[in-house]
């Protein structure tokens, strides 16, 4: 697993005394599972442009490689494309940006690779038909709560839930 920032408090230690303390994450690799879609690719682009190493993941590694090449060419960043499991294993923080229809299954398949990592879930539980998008019910309450339930060994946070 990628190492934690050297200035981070030890696991299980009390929080830093300074409430404004933040670890230096400038060298940490960010993974984007679902990085070939609009939202995942857009966030990968922004992180690469900011200088973070990025790994784009996809069920189809060749699509991930093509997306990574596009993002790297546009940003000059360190961007690689891999399969979803390899993406999850290569990154310290991993964004989940897959369609809700594949959310639970993807998380279940990646649970071991995501253990101990920060997982950022940006999935909105939406379905689509001829009339457009509609909200889907989620037994766990929200997509992020579903992710937290499936990924009990990860630190799950919710972000980037724009529609």
Question: Where are the language model's segments positioned?
Answer:
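NAD(P)+-binding Rossmann beta1-loop-alpha1 motif at the extreme N-terminus of oxidoreductases
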Residues: 2-73
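A glycine-biased structural micro-motif
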Residues: 27, 65, 90, 116, ...
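A generic structural signal for alpha->beta connector loops
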Residues: 51-53, 76-78, 116, 153-156
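Active-site phosphate/pyrophosphate- and oxyanion-stabilizing loops and adjacent acidic/basic residues
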Residues: 69, 108, 145
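Rossmann-like NAD(P)-binding element
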Residues: 74-118, 122-131
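Rossmann-fold NAD(P)-binding glycine/threonine-rich loop
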Residues: 123-163
